[in-house]
Amino acid sequence: NSSTFVIESPKSPVSESFRSIRTNIEYIVQGKDKCVFSVISDSPGIGKTYISINMASIYAMYGKKTVLIGMDLRKPRLYQEFGISNKMGVSSYLAGKASLNEIIQPSGKLPNLDIITAGPIPPNPAELIASDKCSKFFEELKTQYDYIIVDTPPLLWVTDALLLMKHV
């Protein structure tokens, strides 16, 4: 699977490029206990999910407890990349249908990497993301993980990515 490139080819030049990005981020956030960041682009198909997956993998390989969150509630894809279930995810938690522990799944590829998929497509993604429950979601994750990486929807297509900015 090319989306999990750094897992499949950890010694490649591409993997080294992701390590370089990690090192630069470490320099910028030095001294911070927890780090939440998102990968954003203006339109679909640019590589947000690819970069999110590989950055999360690099942090997990570095020994950091990492969670990768699929926050594109309108067009979920992260679950396909890892071959895991999307029956419950962020939308389930935000709608009050699942607890945080119920939606966290091990990646099955790296011991320090967990995945939270988007879950079933809700009728009201923007409202769920704007809710107080979403703030609680991120606060709870900060108590469990060193790095929280958010795979977002395209910035110019829906308001969801803008709503997420207050959490990263």
Feature locations, PLM:
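P-loop NTP-binding module
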Residues: 4-168
